[in-house]
C-alpha cells in the first residue's frame, strides 16, 4: 500500500467523491461540444460503413468507422472487460488530435461501444490524447495514465479517474487538476526530450510502497524507458536512471514491462516479484514500425532491467509477431489468471483506399502470453473464447500430400475461418542446404516464396485463394539443413494476395524453434476477410498479414492445403471451421454527432 501522505489524500478524496457522483464537471472547458447529453459522446453513425465491404472483418475488433490505432488500457473491472483505443472519429486517416475510444465486453469477443473516454480539452492535452495505460490501485480503483500533446506540442503525462466507480462500464472519466504529472524540457536538460516522451506503462508497486512507471523516450538514437517513482500516484519523480536503454534504435514507443512465471502456464500480476518469475520488456520501435521484446531479470535493488545473456536488442530480436503487429499492450486478467495481449494491425492499402472504405485499422485477436518451457521466448495463443465462434467443423483424415499436390478444404466459409493443421516429415538426406549468409528469414521468404519449388517445402495452406489461383495468401514451412540441425522457416507470403497493384504485398518470415523430425509442424490460422493471423509450433512464432483480394472475397474465397516441394509430407491432423460473426461496436445511438467533453475536475473540489 502507498503511504497516506497529503498527495495520496488528494487522490483518495477525489476517488471517494467520484464514487459518489459528487464531482463537478467544468462544462465551459469543452470544445466541439454540441450537447450536454452524455450519450452525444457516442460515435456518430449517420454515415454508416458499407455492410458489403469485403475487407471489413467479422470477428476482429474494429472501431465503428474512421481511424483506429494503438490499443490502450485494456483491463477487467467488476467482471467487465474494457478496451480503450486511439481513435480519430472524423476521418480514416491519423490526426494528432486523437481521442480514446472505449468499448466493453463480457467475453472479449462481442463488444459494446461506449462513449469517448478522453478527448483534447485542456492546455496539457489540447493537441491530442495519445496512448497510455491503466493501473488498478488498491481497493480496485482503476486510473488512466496517458500522454497529452500540450499547447506547445510537447508530450506530457496526465492522470484521469473514473467519475463513478460503481459503474462497471466506466462511461465517464475525469482529468486531474494537477496535470501534467510528468514532463520533459525543450532543452532535454532532465534527460527527457519533450518532443519524444510518450506512452506510460502500467505501473507496478514494490514492497517499499512506491509506485513505478516507465515512459518511452530517446536521446539522439538511444532508446530509453525512463523510470518514474511515486508514493501517491500524483507526484512523480524521475529516478535519473532509465529502467533500461539501448543505443541505435531511436524512440521506444508503448513500452510494456511485466513478469512471467517460470514453469507455469499462468499470467502474473504486474507487481509480482520472486524467484519463480522472469520479466519481459517489450518496446515498439518508431523508426522501423516493428516491436521486439527481451526476457531477463528485474534488479529491484538498482531498479534496472537486465536482459538475459545473448538477448538481441533490436528489431532483429524476438518479436511477438513477425508481420503487421504494433503498439501492443498487455494486461493481467485476475479473474482467469491470464496475461492477455492486444496489438494494432495497420492497413497495407494506400490511403486513398482507406478513405474510400471509410475506416482504417484492426486489433489482432487477443492472445494469452506465457513463458515457453525453455525460458528463452514467449508463447502466444488466441484466447479460448475465440473457439465459441466456430461452426461447421470439417476434419480431414491423416494422409500423405505428394509433391505438387493441392487439396481443397471445402464446406466452410473460407473467407471467415479458423483452421488447425499439423505436418510430419520423414528423416531424409535430401534436404536443401541453408546458405550460411541467409540469416534474415524475411529476406529468405521473399526469395523463396510459395511458387518456388524446394525439397521439403514449401508446404502449408493457401488462404483467401481464388478458384484459378490468380490470388492467394500462402502460409507455409520450408525445411533446410543447417550446420548442426534442421532449420524450419515459416513464411507468410502475400506477393499474390491481390490483383490490386497498389496494395503492399510483402513476405514475412521467421525461423521456428522446433525439431521437424521429432515434432509435428503445426499451424493455426485465423482468416477474417482482410486479415490472416498465423500461429506455428503451438504459438512460438506468429505472423499477421493484411491482404485485399479482388477475386477471393466472401463466398468466392477458397482454402487449400498445398505441397510445392519435391518430397512428400504427411498431414497428421486437420480441422477447419467457419467462424460466426461477432457483435462488435454496434452503436447505441444513431441520432447525434459525437462531442468532445473536457471531463475536467474543478480545482476547488479538492
Swiss-Prot record:
UniProt catalytic activity: Hydrolysis of terminal, non-reducing (2->6)-linked beta-D-fructofuranose residues in fructans
pH dependence: Optimum pH is 5.0.
Top-level taxon: Eukaryota
InterPro entries for the chain: ConA-like_dom_sf, Fructan_Metab_Enzymes, Glyco_hydro_32, Glyco_hydro_32_C, Glyco_hydro_32_N, Glyco_hydro_beta-prop_sf
Regulation: Not inhibited by sucrose.
Active site: 70
Matches recorded under Pfam families: Glyco_hydro_32C, Glyco_hydro_32N
Signal peptide region: 1-21
Class of enzymatic activity (EC top level): hydrolase
UniProt-listed CDD domains: GH32_Fruct1-like
One GO term (biological process): carbohydrate metabolic process
Keywords from the UniProt entry: Disulfide bond, Glycoprotein, Glycosidase, Hydrolase, Signal
Positions bearing carbohydrate: 5, 110, 164, 193, 237, 346, 564, 585, 590, 593
Its job: Hydrolyzes levan-type beta-(2->6)-linked fructans to fructose, but not inulin-type beta-(2->1)-linked fructans.
Full protein name: Fructan 6-exohydrolase
Source organism of the structure: Beta vulgaris
